[in-house]
């Protein structure tokens, strides 16, 4: 397994997996652009683990640390910063939208899947949808 770690203000760690595929009955959904809608404030410290998988590519796992008391706008900024730190800026663009939303778009290359693998942050709800 090959690992690459990136830390941004002590909040973000990214891990690139050298292998891994989805099960046949658990096929990911691909798009060129995704929206992550953040609702509610954090009621605990914790982490959010996202997986970005280019079609027929290597999955990239992005772990974002969230501090207790962070509001939805700041959580969106933490997620945006996590994507920026972990993903190649020549391939992906990320930004916040409406304060509490994060957009992740491809600049070039194949469409990609985006999923929240797990979250240990209490109270925060995320809605991930294709744009």
Outline where the language-model segments fall:
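Bacterial N-terminal signal peptides
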Residues: 9-18
